[in-house]
Amino acid sequence: MSSRDFSNDLFSINIEENAGCVVSAKVQANPLVTQKCHKEALKTVKKNVVLPGFRKGKAPDNIVESRYSTQVEQELRRLFLRASFEALSQMCDRKPLSPKAVRSSAIDTCNPVNGGSVSFLYEAFPVIPSLPWEQLSLPDPEPVKEISEEDLENGLKNVAYFFATKTPVTRPSQEGDFISLSLYVSKRGDENSTPVAIFENKYFKISEEDMTDSFKARFLNVSTGHRVEEEIGSEDIQSFLNGDLLTFTVNAVIEISSPEMDDEKARQLQAESLEDLKKKLRIQLENQAKEAQHQKRFSDAEDALAQLIDFDLPESLLQEREELLSREKLLNARLVKYCSDSELEEQKQALLEEAKADARKAVKLLFLTQKVFSEKGLSISREELQYMMDVCSRERFGGYPPKDISNEMIQELVLVARDRLTYRKAIEAISSEKKDLEVVPS
């Protein structure tokens, strides 16, 4: 714990810094501050009252204060609290993360004659030391994957699905079929429980590539209408889903018959011939390989930056991200990888440790990328910001945002878009820069 002081002509502030970026602060104001707040409070109350013999808002101050002392006092305290928070945010180098980061605020004293004091407990922005760039360990970029004939053939098979015959069948499902599944969660034995859809009419290919072994075993050799009920034993999953019974329903079993690709089908896909289609497909696969290399480089830069330095992180942000990632990982194991309750229990500790590490990395990078963005003198163009706002808007509202979107929502979209661009540009600067960074072979 460390204690420091800040002051100017109107305020004196003492802060005590604790682990988790938790700061307790005492803000003391001289009488000039409380006198100003009192004057504004009286003016606010006065303009809203009507007294006999006076026009609205024109009653003498002493009469208003005498008759509406409670309202004046409440407004005075509100204004004084706001002024104290503004002083704390402007004068102190451990600024609150946001108004929501204030855990508690208490007015200790507030008097127009004698001044006042306020106590705050809040989470502050972390203190990040200078970044030791000479210690950054970034592996060399991996070579772009070469596209093999096998890759090309697999790509053609995927293209052939465009022309495939999709036939619902009554026979039991078999390898290579698609099945349409719906999954609902409910509360066993609760007559008032209404099943809630986790997904409906979602298509899965019965294959080793697209299904885990346990998931595949459940839906191989089953027919349309088949139902699988599964009790959820994990209390974590029960809590996340608000239920303890999963019900899978097979809506359809679909047989896929894909034709051989030829020149005619290639022309339907805007290619001159099958050979031309293969050339275009190869270019597409090569571009995908380049993007995969870029994403790997981006991920390596994230890891390198996160490992570069350690510093204290805001407690609540860390906890919030850890809870979110823990939920995602446990649900993914249960509903996507289709682990049984016993398998989930075996993996649970490792998954929670993984979530904890990932949460710490994510929160560290949130603040480190802001520092890198500032130190490297990076910038965001108007066009980049508008494009990212459009992306964020589509994610929030779909393809058709509301016409009467509020100013608050626009501001939120701007902040989210700016944060994303800041993060991306900072990481890309690290992944591409050479001259000032130590780059080591992998």
Swiss-Prot record:
UniProt key word Cell membrane: no
Molecular function as annotated in GO: peptidyl-prolyl cis-trans isomerase activity
EC code(s) of this entry: 5.2.1.8
Keyword flag Isomerase: yes
Chain coiled-coil ranges: none
Domain PPIase FKBP-type, residue spans: 176-259
Gene3D superfamilies associated with the record: 3.10.50.40, Trigger factor ribosome-binding domain (3.30.70.1050), Trigger factor, C-terminal domain (1.10.3120.10)
Role, per record: Involved in protein export. Acts as a chaperone by maintaining the newly synthesized protein in an open conformation. Functions as a peptidyl-prolyl cis-trans isomerase.
Annotated HAMAP family: Trigger_factor_Tig
Comment on protein domains: Consists of 3 domains; the N-terminus binds the ribosome, the middle domain has PPIase activity, while the C-terminus has intrinsic chaperone activity on its own.
Designated name of the protein: Trigger factor
Species annotation: Chlamydia trachomatis serovar A (strain ATCC VR-571B / DSM 19440 / HAR-13)
